[in-house]
Amino acid sequence: MRSDNIKKGINRTSHRSLLRACGLDDNDMKKPFIGIANSYTDIVPGHIHLKDLVQEVKEVIRLEGGVPFEFDTMAVCDGIAMNHEGMYYSLPSREIIANTVESMAMAHQFDALILMPTCDKVVPGMIMAAARLNIPAIVITGGPMMPGKFHGETVDFINVTEAVGATQSGKMSEEDLYELERCACPGAGSCAGLFTANTMACLTETMGMSLPGCATAHAVSDKKVEIARASAKKIFTLLENDIKPSDILTQEAFENAIKVDLALGGSTNTTLHIPAIANEVDGVDVTIDLFDKLSHEVPYICSIRPGGNNRMIDVENAGGIPAVMKNMESILNTDCITCTSNSVKENLEKVSDIDYNVIHTLDDPIRTEGGIAVLYGNVAPNGCVIKQGAVNEDMLVHSGPCKVFNSEEECVLAIENDEIIDGDVVVIRYEGPKGGPGMREMLNPTAAIMGRELFHVALITDGRFSGGSRGPCIGHISPEAAEGGPIGAIENGDIVSINVKERTIKLELTDDEIKERLSKVKPVERNLKGWLKQYQKLATSADKGAILK
Protein backbone atom coordinates (compact mmCIF):
# COMPACT_ATOMS: atom_id res chain seq x y z
CA MET A 1 0.00 0.00 0.00
CA ARG A 2 1.14 3.53 -0.74
CA SER A 3 0.27 4.51 2.82
CA ASP A 4 2.90 2.06 4.08
CA ASN A 5 5.33 4.88 3.33
CA ILE A 6 4.09 6.53 6.53
CA LYS A 7 3.07 3.57 8.68
CA LYS A 8 5.15 0.41 8.06
CA GLY A 9 8.44 -0.60 9.61
CA ILE A 10 10.64 0.57 12.44
CA ASN A 11 11.64 3.71 10.54
CA ARG A 12 8.03 4.83 10.63
CA THR A 13 7.61 4.52 14.40
CA SER A 14 7.43 8.27 14.90
CA HIS A 15 4.90 8.57 12.07
CA ARG A 16 2.68 5.95 13.72
CA SER A 17 2.96 7.77 17.01
CA LEU A 18 1.41 10.84 15.41
CA LEU A 19 -1.27 8.74 13.73
CA ARG A 20 -2.17 7.24 17.10
CA ALA A 21 -2.68 10.78 18.37
CA CYS A 22 -5.42 11.02 15.72
CA GLY A 23 -7.14 7.96 17.18
CA LEU A 24 -5.72 5.13 15.07
CA ASP A 25 -4.90 1.71 16.56
CA ASP A 26 -2.84 -1.30 15.47
CA ASN A 27 -5.62 -2.64 13.26
CA ASP A 28 -5.99 0.69 11.46
CA MET A 29 -2.31 0.59 10.50
CA LYS A 30 -3.08 -2.45 8.30
CA LYS A 31 -5.89 -0.74 6.38
CA PRO A 32 -5.84 1.49 3.30
CA PHE A 33 -5.86 5.20 4.02
CA ILE A 34 -8.54 6.97 2.00
CA GLY A 35 -8.19 10.74 1.67
CA ILE A 36 -11.39 12.74 1.35
CA ALA A 37 -11.01 16.22 -0.14
CA ASN A 38 -14.07 18.04 1.14
CA SER A 39 -14.83 21.58 -0.04
CA TYR A 40 -17.46 22.29 2.61
CA THR A 41 -17.92 25.93 3.58
CA ASP A 42 -20.67 27.93 5.27
CA ILE A 43 -20.78 30.69 2.63
CA VAL A 44 -21.25 28.77 -0.65
CA PRO A 45 -24.76 27.33 -1.26
CA GLY A 46 -23.32 24.55 -3.40
CA HIS A 47 -21.18 23.34 -0.51
CA ILE A 48 -23.18 23.85 2.68
CA HIS A 49 -24.50 20.27 2.68
CA LEU A 50 -21.14 18.57 2.19
CA LYS A 51 -20.51 18.62 5.94
CA ASP A 52 -23.30 16.07 6.35
CA LEU A 53 -22.71 14.19 3.10
CA VAL A 54 -19.10 13.43 4.01
CA GLN A 55 -20.26 11.60 7.14
CA GLU A 56 -22.06 9.10 4.90
CA VAL A 57 -18.86 8.63 2.92
CA LYS A 58 -16.76 8.09 6.04
CA GLU A 59 -19.19 5.53 7.43
CA VAL A 60 -18.98 3.41 4.29
CA ILE A 61 -15.19 3.62 4.17
CA ARG A 62 -15.01 2.27 7.71
CA LEU A 63 -17.50 -0.50 6.90
CA GLU A 64 -15.45 -1.48 3.85
CA GLY A 65 -12.25 -1.77 5.85
CA GLY A 66 -10.54 1.54 5.22
CA VAL A 67 -9.53 4.53 7.30
CA PRO A 68 -11.06 7.84 6.14
CA PHE A 69 -9.08 11.06 6.45
CA GLU A 70 -11.07 14.17 5.65
CA PHE A 71 -9.28 17.37 4.74
CA ASP A 72 -10.59 20.68 3.52
CA THR A 73 -9.93 22.82 0.51
CA MET A 74 -11.34 26.16 -0.52
CA ALA A 75 -14.44 26.96 -2.57
CA VAL A 76 -15.38 30.31 -4.11
CA CYS A 77 -19.00 31.17 -4.92
CA ASP A 78 -18.80 33.06 -8.20
CA GLY A 79 -22.22 34.55 -7.62
CA ILE A 80 -21.09 36.14 -4.35
CA ALA A 81 -17.68 37.10 -5.77
CA MET A 82 -19.33 38.71 -8.80
CA ASN A 83 -18.86 42.34 -9.87
CA HIS A 84 -16.26 43.37 -7.28
CA GLU A 85 -12.59 42.76 -6.56
CA GLY A 86 -13.35 39.27 -5.25
CA MET A 87 -13.93 37.99 -8.79
CA TYR A 88 -10.23 38.48 -9.54
CA TYR A 89 -9.65 35.48 -7.26
CA SER A 90 -12.19 33.04 -8.69
CA LEU A 91 -10.32 31.47 -11.61
CA PRO A 92 -6.98 31.58 -9.75
CA SER A 93 -8.63 29.56 -6.97
CA ARG A 94 -8.68 26.58 -9.37
CA GLU A 95 -4.90 26.38 -9.13
CA ILE A 96 -4.92 26.72 -5.34
CA ILE A 97 -7.45 23.89 -5.06
CA ALA A 98 -5.40 21.64 -7.33
CA ASN A 99 -2.22 22.42 -5.41
CA THR A 100 -3.91 21.91 -2.03
CA VAL A 101 -5.27 18.47 -2.89
CA GLU A 102 -1.97 17.44 -4.47
CA SER A 103 -0.02 18.64 -1.42
CA MET A 104 -2.23 16.86 1.11
CA ALA A 105 -2.26 13.59 -0.80
CA MET A 106 1.50 13.59 -1.30
CA ALA A 107 2.38 14.67 2.24
CA HIS A 108 0.20 11.99 3.81
CA GLN A 109 0.56 9.24 1.18
CA PHE A 110 -3.11 8.37 0.82
CA ASP A 111 -3.83 5.15 -1.03
CA ALA A 112 -6.84 6.62 -2.80
CA LEU A 113 -8.88 9.79 -2.96
CA ILE A 114 -12.54 10.69 -2.78
CA LEU A 115 -13.12 14.20 -4.11
CA MET A 116 -16.16 16.20 -3.01
CA PRO A 117 -16.54 19.41 -5.06
CA THR A 118 -19.62 21.23 -6.27
CA CYS A 119 -19.00 24.66 -7.71
CA ASP A 120 -17.26 26.12 -10.72
CA LYS A 121 -13.52 26.00 -10.05
CA VAL A 122 -13.58 23.31 -7.40
CA VAL A 123 -14.56 20.51 -9.78
CA PRO A 124 -11.75 21.07 -12.30
CA GLY A 125 -9.26 21.95 -9.57
CA MET A 126 -9.80 18.66 -7.78
CA ILE A 127 -9.69 16.61 -10.99
CA MET A 128 -6.46 18.36 -12.03
CA ALA A 129 -4.97 17.20 -8.73
CA ALA A 130 -6.26 13.66 -9.22
CA ALA A 131 -4.67 13.55 -12.67
CA ARG A 132 -1.32 14.76 -11.28
CA LEU A 133 -1.34 12.29 -8.41
CA ASN A 134 -2.61 9.39 -10.52
CA ILE A 135 -3.80 7.31 -7.58
CA PRO A 136 -7.28 5.71 -7.55
CA ALA A 137 -9.84 8.48 -7.24
CA ILE A 138 -13.56 9.07 -7.55
CA VAL A 139 -15.54 12.31 -7.61
CA ILE A 140 -18.81 12.97 -5.78
CA THR A 141 -20.17 16.25 -7.10
CA GLY A 142 -22.46 17.98 -4.62
CA GLY A 143 -25.47 18.26 -6.91
CA PRO A 144 -27.75 21.00 -8.23
CA MET A 145 -29.98 23.31 -6.24
CA MET A 146 -33.71 23.00 -6.67
CA PRO A 147 -35.26 25.94 -8.54
CA GLY A 148 -37.51 28.42 -6.78
CA LYS A 149 -41.03 29.67 -7.47
CA PHE A 150 -41.99 33.29 -8.09
CA HIS A 151 -45.55 34.31 -8.95
CA GLY A 152 -46.18 30.78 -10.19
CA GLU A 153 -43.08 30.74 -12.42
CA THR A 154 -40.01 28.55 -11.95
CA VAL A 155 -36.95 30.72 -11.24
CA ASP A 156 -33.25 30.49 -10.42
CA PHE A 157 -30.28 32.69 -9.57
CA ILE A 158 -29.95 34.08 -13.10
CA ASN A 159 -33.52 35.37 -12.94
CA VAL A 160 -32.37 37.50 -10.01
CA THR A 161 -29.31 38.89 -11.80
CA GLU A 162 -31.36 39.89 -14.84
CA ALA A 163 -34.15 41.29 -12.67
CA VAL A 164 -31.73 43.88 -11.26
CA GLY A 165 -31.39 45.43 -14.71
CA ALA A 166 -35.14 45.19 -15.23
CA THR A 167 -35.74 47.04 -11.95
CA GLN A 168 -33.16 49.74 -12.71
CA SER A 169 -34.82 50.38 -16.07
CA GLY A 170 -38.33 50.54 -14.58
CA LYS A 171 -39.55 47.22 -15.96
CA MET A 172 -39.92 45.63 -12.51
CA SER A 173 -40.80 46.98 -9.09
CA GLU A 174 -38.39 46.91 -6.17
CA GLU A 175 -41.02 45.01 -4.19
CA ASP A 176 -41.09 42.22 -6.77
CA LEU A 177 -37.30 42.19 -6.93
CA TYR A 178 -37.13 41.73 -3.16
CA GLU A 179 -39.65 38.90 -3.33
CA LEU A 180 -37.67 37.24 -6.12
CA GLU A 181 -34.45 37.62 -4.12
CA ARG A 182 -36.02 35.68 -1.27
CA CYS A 183 -37.34 32.72 -3.26
CA ALA A 184 -35.02 32.11 -6.23
CA CYS A 185 -32.39 30.09 -4.35
CA PRO A 186 -34.27 27.81 -1.93
CA GLY A 187 -31.38 25.82 -0.46
CA ALA A 188 -28.24 23.76 -0.92
CA GLY A 189 -26.74 22.96 -4.29
CA SER A 190 -25.16 24.52 -7.35
CA CYS A 191 -27.39 27.05 -9.14
CA ALA A 192 -30.30 25.29 -10.80
CA GLY A 193 -29.49 25.72 -14.51
CA LEU A 194 -26.73 24.43 -16.75
CA PHE A 195 -24.27 26.99 -15.49
CA THR A 196 -20.56 26.25 -15.01
CA ALA A 197 -20.78 24.10 -11.87
CA ASN A 198 -23.45 21.80 -13.25
CA THR A 199 -21.77 21.69 -16.65
CA MET A 200 -18.54 20.51 -15.04
CA ALA A 201 -20.43 17.93 -12.97
CA CYS A 202 -22.02 16.58 -16.17
CA LEU A 203 -18.64 16.35 -17.89
CA THR A 204 -17.06 14.70 -14.85
CA GLU A 205 -19.69 11.99 -15.08
CA THR A 206 -19.24 11.74 -18.85
CA MET A 207 -15.47 11.29 -18.52
CA GLY A 208 -16.07 8.50 -16.04
CA MET A 209 -14.72 10.12 -12.89
CA SER A 210 -18.07 10.02 -11.07
CA LEU A 211 -20.77 7.36 -10.96
CA PRO A 212 -23.64 7.37 -13.47
CA GLY A 213 -26.42 9.65 -12.26
CA CYS A 214 -24.19 11.68 -9.96
CA ALA A 215 -24.24 14.99 -11.87
CA THR A 216 -27.99 15.56 -11.81
CA ALA A 217 -28.75 13.95 -8.45
CA HIS A 218 -29.82 17.04 -6.55
CA ALA A 219 -28.05 18.21 -3.41
CA VAL A 220 -31.07 17.69 -1.16
CA SER A 221 -32.13 14.33 -2.62
CA ASP A 222 -31.91 10.86 -1.12
CA LYS A 223 -30.36 9.81 -4.43
CA LYS A 224 -27.35 12.02 -3.75
CA VAL A 225 -26.78 10.25 -0.44
CA GLU A 226 -27.11 6.86 -2.16
CA ILE A 227 -24.58 7.84 -4.83
CA ALA A 228 -22.18 9.21 -2.22
CA ARG A 229 -22.32 5.92 -0.32
CA ALA A 230 -21.95 3.90 -3.52
CA SER A 231 -18.95 6.02 -4.51
CA ALA A 232 -17.28 5.38 -1.15
CA LYS A 233 -17.73 1.67 -1.70
CA LYS A 234 -16.55 1.85 -5.31
CA ILE A 235 -13.22 3.43 -4.35
CA PHE A 236 -12.18 0.04 -2.98
CA THR A 237 -12.88 -1.59 -6.35
CA LEU A 238 -10.70 1.01 -8.02
CA LEU A 239 -7.99 0.46 -5.41
CA GLU A 240 -8.08 -3.34 -5.68
CA ASN A 241 -7.93 -3.23 -9.48
CA ASP A 242 -5.42 -0.35 -9.57
CA ILE A 243 -7.68 1.72 -11.83
CA LYS A 244 -6.17 5.19 -11.85
CA PRO A 245 -7.20 8.54 -13.36
CA SER A 246 -4.79 7.94 -16.25
CA ASP A 247 -6.82 4.84 -17.14
CA ILE A 248 -10.02 6.88 -17.20
CA LEU A 249 -8.92 10.31 -18.44
CA THR A 250 -7.91 9.26 -21.95
CA GLN A 251 -8.03 11.27 -25.16
CA GLU A 252 -11.26 9.48 -26.03
CA ALA A 253 -12.81 10.28 -22.64
CA PHE A 254 -12.06 13.98 -23.10
CA GLU A 255 -13.61 13.87 -26.55
CA ASN A 256 -16.72 12.28 -25.04
CA ALA A 257 -16.87 15.09 -22.49
CA ILE A 258 -16.62 17.77 -25.15
CA LYS A 259 -19.30 16.07 -27.25
CA VAL A 260 -21.71 15.97 -24.31
CA ASP A 261 -20.80 19.56 -23.46
CA LEU A 262 -21.72 20.63 -27.00
CA ALA A 263 -24.90 18.55 -27.01
CA LEU A 264 -26.03 20.20 -23.76
CA GLY A 265 -24.94 23.74 -24.66
CA GLY A 266 -22.74 23.93 -21.58
CA SER A 267 -20.78 26.82 -20.13
CA THR A 268 -17.96 28.34 -22.19
CA ASN A 269 -15.78 27.98 -19.09
CA THR A 270 -15.34 24.35 -20.12
CA THR A 271 -12.97 25.61 -22.82
CA LEU A 272 -10.71 26.67 -19.94
CA HIS A 273 -11.22 23.75 -17.58
CA ILE A 274 -11.20 20.72 -19.88
CA PRO A 275 -7.86 21.72 -21.50
CA ALA A 276 -6.48 22.48 -18.02
CA ILE A 277 -7.37 18.98 -16.80
CA ALA A 278 -6.04 17.42 -20.01
CA ASN A 279 -2.77 19.28 -19.51
CA GLU A 280 -2.19 17.18 -16.39
CA VAL A 281 -2.46 13.87 -18.27
CA ASP A 282 0.43 12.51 -20.32
CA GLY A 283 -0.38 11.77 -23.94
CA VAL A 284 -3.58 13.82 -24.10
CA ASP A 285 -4.01 16.90 -26.28
CA VAL A 286 -7.12 19.06 -25.94
CA THR A 287 -7.33 22.53 -27.50
CA ILE A 288 -10.16 24.95 -28.22
CA ASP A 289 -9.90 23.90 -31.87
CA LEU A 290 -11.16 20.47 -30.83
CA PHE A 291 -14.27 22.07 -29.34
CA ASP A 292 -15.01 23.81 -32.62
CA LYS A 293 -14.21 20.78 -34.78
CA LEU A 294 -16.63 18.66 -32.79
CA SER A 295 -19.20 21.47 -32.71
CA HIS A 296 -19.66 21.00 -36.45
CA GLU A 297 -20.29 17.29 -35.88
CA VAL A 298 -22.36 17.18 -32.68
CA PRO A 299 -25.90 18.62 -32.60
CA TYR A 300 -27.45 20.56 -29.73
CA ILE A 301 -30.03 18.15 -28.25
CA CYS A 302 -30.87 19.37 -24.75
CA SER A 303 -31.90 22.97 -24.13
CA ILE A 304 -31.29 23.99 -20.53
CA ARG A 305 -31.14 27.36 -18.80
CA PRO A 306 -29.70 29.79 -19.79
CA GLY A 307 -30.01 28.55 -23.37
CA GLY A 308 -33.51 27.16 -22.85
CA ASN A 309 -36.27 26.83 -20.28
CA ASN A 310 -35.38 23.47 -18.72
CA ARG A 311 -33.41 23.27 -15.50
CA MET A 312 -31.30 20.52 -13.99
CA ILE A 313 -34.29 18.97 -12.24
CA ASP A 314 -35.93 18.52 -15.65
CA VAL A 315 -32.80 16.80 -16.96
CA GLU A 316 -32.73 14.59 -13.86
CA ASN A 317 -36.36 13.61 -14.36
CA ALA A 318 -35.69 12.96 -18.06
CA GLY A 319 -32.97 10.42 -17.24
CA GLY A 320 -29.90 12.52 -16.43
CA ILE A 321 -26.53 12.26 -18.12
CA PRO A 322 -26.92 8.49 -18.71
CA ALA A 323 -29.93 9.32 -20.88
CA VAL A 324 -28.03 12.05 -22.73
CA MET A 325 -25.16 9.64 -23.40
CA LYS A 326 -27.56 6.88 -24.44
CA ASN A 327 -29.05 9.17 -27.06
CA MET A 328 -25.52 9.99 -28.22
CA GLU A 329 -24.14 6.46 -27.98
CA SER A 330 -23.50 6.16 -31.71
CA ILE A 331 -21.04 9.10 -31.68
CA LEU A 332 -19.33 8.44 -28.34
CA ASN A 333 -16.21 6.41 -27.62
CA THR A 334 -17.96 3.65 -25.69
CA ASP A 335 -14.89 1.53 -24.92
CA CYS A 336 -13.64 4.06 -22.37
CA ILE A 337 -13.20 2.66 -18.86
CA THR A 338 -14.98 4.51 -16.06
CA CYS A 339 -14.92 4.62 -12.27
CA THR A 340 -17.58 1.89 -12.24
CA SER A 341 -14.69 -0.33 -13.49
CA ASN A 342 -16.90 -0.95 -16.52
CA SER A 343 -16.88 0.68 -19.94
CA VAL A 344 -19.20 3.44 -21.11
CA LYS A 345 -20.98 0.85 -23.27
CA GLU A 346 -21.59 -1.40 -20.28
CA ASN A 347 -22.81 1.54 -18.19
CA LEU A 348 -25.36 2.46 -20.86
CA GLU A 349 -26.77 -1.03 -21.46
CA LYS A 350 -29.69 -0.69 -19.05
CA VAL A 351 -30.50 2.99 -19.61
CA SER A 352 -34.14 3.49 -20.60
CA ASP A 353 -37.17 5.68 -19.79
CA ILE A 354 -35.79 8.76 -21.53
CA ASP A 355 -37.99 11.84 -21.87
CA TYR A 356 -37.34 12.81 -25.48
CA ASN A 357 -39.11 16.14 -25.02
CA VAL A 358 -36.22 17.21 -22.80
CA ILE A 359 -33.36 15.13 -24.21
CA HIS A 360 -33.72 14.99 -27.98
CA THR A 361 -32.27 12.34 -30.25
CA LEU A 362 -29.46 13.04 -32.71
CA ASP A 363 -32.02 12.76 -35.52
CA ASP A 364 -34.27 15.38 -33.93
CA PRO A 365 -31.91 18.05 -32.59
CA ILE A 366 -32.77 21.51 -31.35
CA ARG A 367 -29.96 22.85 -33.55
CA THR A 368 -27.70 21.02 -35.94
CA GLU A 369 -24.49 22.37 -34.40
CA GLY A 370 -23.18 22.07 -30.86
CA GLY A 371 -23.68 24.73 -28.22
CA ILE A 372 -20.18 26.28 -28.30
CA ALA A 373 -18.37 27.85 -31.26
CA VAL A 374 -14.83 29.18 -31.61
CA LEU A 375 -14.34 32.32 -33.70
CA TYR A 376 -11.17 33.70 -35.28
CA GLY A 377 -10.26 36.97 -36.93
CA ASN A 378 -8.20 40.11 -36.54
CA VAL A 379 -9.82 40.78 -33.14
CA ALA A 380 -8.88 37.31 -31.89
CA PRO A 381 -6.06 35.74 -33.93
CA ASN A 382 -5.75 32.91 -31.39
CA GLY A 383 -9.49 32.47 -31.01
CA CYS A 384 -12.44 33.37 -28.81
CA VAL A 385 -15.55 31.48 -27.72
CA ILE A 386 -19.31 31.97 -27.77
CA LYS A 387 -22.15 29.87 -26.41
CA GLN A 388 -24.05 29.83 -29.69
CA GLY A 389 -26.76 27.62 -28.20
CA ALA A 390 -27.81 30.60 -26.02
CA VAL A 391 -27.85 33.12 -28.88
CA ASN A 392 -31.00 34.00 -30.80
CA GLU A 393 -30.78 33.12 -34.49
CA ASP A 394 -31.04 36.78 -35.52
CA MET A 395 -27.84 37.64 -33.60
CA LEU A 396 -25.61 34.90 -35.01
CA VAL A 397 -24.57 37.51 -37.57
CA HIS A 398 -24.13 41.07 -36.30
CA SER A 399 -22.19 44.21 -37.13
CA GLY A 400 -22.21 47.35 -35.04
CA PRO A 401 -20.35 50.31 -33.55
CA CYS A 402 -18.17 49.70 -30.52
CA LYS A 403 -18.47 51.13 -27.03
CA VAL A 404 -15.10 50.44 -25.40
CA PHE A 405 -14.33 49.96 -21.69
CA ASN A 406 -11.11 49.06 -19.88
CA SER A 407 -12.86 47.35 -16.98
CA GLU A 408 -16.11 45.65 -16.05
CA GLU A 409 -16.99 48.47 -13.64
CA GLU A 410 -16.77 51.13 -16.37
CA CYS A 411 -19.09 49.09 -18.56
CA VAL A 412 -21.68 48.45 -15.86
CA LEU A 413 -21.81 52.18 -15.07
CA ALA A 414 -22.40 52.97 -18.74
CA ILE A 415 -25.21 50.42 -18.95
CA GLU A 416 -26.84 51.84 -15.81
CA ASN A 417 -26.60 55.33 -17.35
CA ASP A 418 -28.39 54.08 -20.49
CA GLU A 419 -25.35 54.74 -22.69
CA ILE A 420 -25.70 51.37 -24.45
CA ILE A 421 -28.30 51.04 -27.20
CA ASP A 422 -29.50 48.23 -29.44
CA GLY A 423 -27.02 47.53 -32.22
CA ASP A 424 -23.92 48.33 -30.18
CA VAL A 425 -20.93 46.06 -29.74
CA VAL A 426 -19.74 46.44 -26.14
CA VAL A 427 -15.99 45.86 -25.70
CA ILE A 428 -14.57 45.07 -22.24
CA ARG A 429 -10.81 44.57 -22.19
CA TYR A 430 -7.91 44.25 -19.75
CA GLU A 431 -9.95 41.54 -18.01
CA GLY A 432 -7.96 38.54 -19.27
CA PRO A 433 -5.87 36.08 -17.24
CA LYS A 434 -2.99 38.56 -16.98
CA GLY A 435 -4.85 41.82 -17.53
CA GLY A 436 -7.42 41.42 -14.77
CA PRO A 437 -5.66 39.54 -13.54
CA GLY A 438 -7.79 36.47 -13.02
CA MET A 439 -10.14 36.72 -16.02
CA ARG A 440 -13.27 37.89 -14.24
CA GLU A 441 -16.75 36.79 -15.30
CA MET A 442 -18.86 39.43 -17.01
CA LEU A 443 -22.23 38.25 -15.67
CA ASN A 444 -23.30 41.64 -14.35
CA PRO A 445 -22.89 43.42 -17.71
CA THR A 446 -24.64 40.65 -19.64
CA ALA A 447 -27.44 40.39 -17.08
CA ALA A 448 -27.86 44.18 -17.06
CA ILE A 449 -28.12 44.19 -20.84
CA MET A 450 -30.69 41.37 -20.84
CA GLY A 451 -32.63 42.94 -17.98
CA ARG A 452 -33.01 46.10 -20.08
CA GLU A 453 -34.19 43.98 -23.03
CA LEU A 454 -31.31 45.12 -25.22
CA PHE A 455 -31.48 41.92 -27.23
CA HIS A 456 -29.45 43.24 -30.17
CA VAL A 457 -26.32 44.21 -28.25
CA ALA A 458 -23.19 42.05 -28.57
CA LEU A 459 -20.51 41.96 -25.88
CA ILE A 460 -16.92 40.96 -26.57
CA THR A 461 -14.19 40.62 -23.96
CA ASP A 462 -10.83 39.09 -23.11
CA GLY A 463 -12.49 38.16 -19.83
CA ARG A 464 -14.93 35.31 -19.49
CA PHE A 465 -18.60 34.74 -18.78
CA SER A 466 -20.68 33.07 -16.16
CA GLY A 467 -22.32 29.86 -17.28
CA GLY A 468 -25.50 31.83 -16.68
CA SER A 469 -24.79 34.46 -19.34
CA ARG A 470 -26.89 34.35 -22.48
CA GLY A 471 -27.04 36.26 -25.71
CA PRO A 472 -24.25 37.20 -28.15
CA CYS A 473 -21.45 37.17 -25.58
CA ILE A 474 -18.00 36.48 -26.98
CA GLY A 475 -15.25 35.87 -24.45
CA HIS A 476 -11.71 34.54 -24.01
CA ILE A 477 -10.43 36.81 -26.80
CA SER A 478 -6.82 35.78 -27.35
CA PRO A 479 -4.31 37.26 -27.21
CA GLU A 480 -5.69 39.51 -24.49
CA ALA A 481 -5.20 43.27 -24.34
CA ALA A 482 -2.55 43.02 -21.62
CA GLU A 483 -0.49 40.82 -23.94
CA GLY A 484 -0.73 43.25 -26.83
CA GLY A 485 -3.76 41.64 -28.45
CA PRO A 486 -5.67 43.52 -31.19
CA ILE A 487 -8.64 44.05 -28.86
CA GLY A 488 -6.43 46.78 -27.36
CA ALA A 489 -6.59 48.71 -30.64
CA ILE A 490 -10.38 49.07 -30.74
CA GLU A 491 -11.74 52.60 -30.29
CA ASN A 492 -15.24 53.96 -29.71
CA GLY A 493 -17.21 53.97 -32.94
CA ASP A 494 -15.14 51.31 -34.70
CA ILE A 495 -17.19 48.65 -36.42
CA VAL A 496 -16.84 45.02 -35.38
CA SER A 497 -18.50 42.34 -37.50
CA ILE A 498 -19.41 38.98 -35.98
CA ASN A 499 -20.44 35.93 -37.99
CA VAL A 500 -20.91 32.90 -35.77
CA LYS A 501 -22.00 30.75 -38.69
CA GLU A 502 -18.72 31.41 -40.49
CA ARG A 503 -16.73 31.48 -37.20
CA THR A 504 -15.35 34.97 -37.78
CA ILE A 505 -14.93 38.16 -35.77
CA LYS A 506 -13.48 41.17 -37.57
CA LEU A 507 -12.52 44.71 -36.67
CA GLU A 508 -13.16 46.78 -39.81
CA LEU A 509 -9.62 48.14 -40.00
CA THR A 510 -6.61 47.13 -42.06
CA ASP A 511 -3.77 45.18 -40.49
CA ASP A 512 -1.55 48.25 -40.83
CA GLU A 513 -4.10 50.44 -39.04
CA ILE A 514 -4.35 47.96 -36.18
CA LYS A 515 -0.56 47.72 -35.94
CA GLU A 516 -0.23 51.51 -35.89
CA ARG A 517 -2.79 51.86 -33.10
CA LEU A 518 -1.22 49.10 -31.01
CA SER A 519 2.15 50.85 -31.21
CA LYS A 520 0.60 53.80 -29.35
CA VAL A 521 -1.38 51.87 -26.74
CA LYS A 522 -0.41 52.35 -23.12
CA PRO A 523 -1.41 49.15 -21.27
CA VAL A 524 -3.57 49.47 -18.18
CA GLU A 525 -1.43 48.90 -15.08
CA ARG A 526 -2.77 47.18 -11.97
CA ASN A 527 -1.34 47.78 -8.50
CA LEU A 528 -0.99 44.17 -7.43
CA LYS A 529 0.31 42.29 -4.43
CA GLY A 530 0.11 38.81 -2.97
CA TRP A 531 -1.43 35.91 -4.88
CA LEU A 532 -2.73 38.02 -7.78
CA LYS A 533 0.76 39.36 -8.46
CA GLN A 534 2.09 35.80 -8.58
CA TYR A 535 -0.81 34.64 -10.74
CA GLN A 536 -0.32 37.43 -13.27
CA LYS A 537 3.30 36.40 -13.80
CA LEU A 538 2.45 32.73 -14.32
CA ALA A 539 -0.94 32.70 -16.09
CA THR A 540 -1.12 31.69 -19.73
CA SER A 541 -3.63 32.80 -22.34
CA ALA A 542 -7.28 31.78 -22.32
CA ASP A 543 -6.80 29.71 -25.47
CA LYS A 544 -4.36 27.59 -23.41
CA GLY A 545 -6.82 27.11 -20.54
CA ALA A 546 -5.28 29.93 -18.45
CA ILE A 547 -3.05 27.33 -16.82
CA LEU A 548 0.08 28.38 -14.96
CA LYS A 549 3.48 28.07 -16.58
UniProtKB/Swiss-Prot annotation:
Binding, Mg(2+): D78, D120, K121, E441
Q: What does this protein do?
A: Functions in the biosynthesis of branched-chain amino acids. Catalyzes the dehydration of (2R,3R)-2,3-dihydroxy-3-methylpentanoate (2,3-dihydroxy-3-methylvalerate) into 2-oxo-3-methylpentanoate (2-oxo-3-methylvalerate) and of (2R)-2,3-dihydroxy-3-methylbutanoate (2,3-dihydroxyisovalerate) into 2-oxo-3-methylbutanoate (2-oxoisovalerate), the penultimate precursor to L-isoleucine and L-valine, respectively.
Molecular function terms, GO-annotated = 2 iron, 2 sulfur cluster binding; dihydroxy-acid dehydratase activity; magnesium ion binding
| Residue positions, PTM N6-carboxylysine | K121
Protein's UniProt name:
Dihydroxy-acid dehydratase
GO biological process, alphabetically ordered: isoleucine biosynthetic process; L-valine biosynthetic process
Q: Which organism is it from?
A: Methanosphaera stadtmanae (strain ATCC 43021 / DSM 3091 / JCM 11832 / MCB-3)
Entry EC number(s): 4.2.1.9
Obligatory cofactor(s): [2Fe-2S] cluster; Mg(2+)
Q: Is Chloroplast a UniProt keyword of this protein? A: no
Please name the Gene3D superfamilies in this protein's record.
IlvD/EDD C-terminal domain-like
InterPro entries recorded: Dihydro-acid_dehy_C (IPR042096), DihydroxyA_deHydtase (IPR004404), DiOHA_6PGluconate_deHydtase_CS (IPR020558), ILV_EDD_C (IPR056740), ILV_EDD_N (IPR000581), IlvD/EDD_N (IPR037237)
UniProt cross-references to HAMAP family, sorted A to Z: IlvD
Query: What protein family is recorded?
Result: Belongs to the IlvD/Edd family.
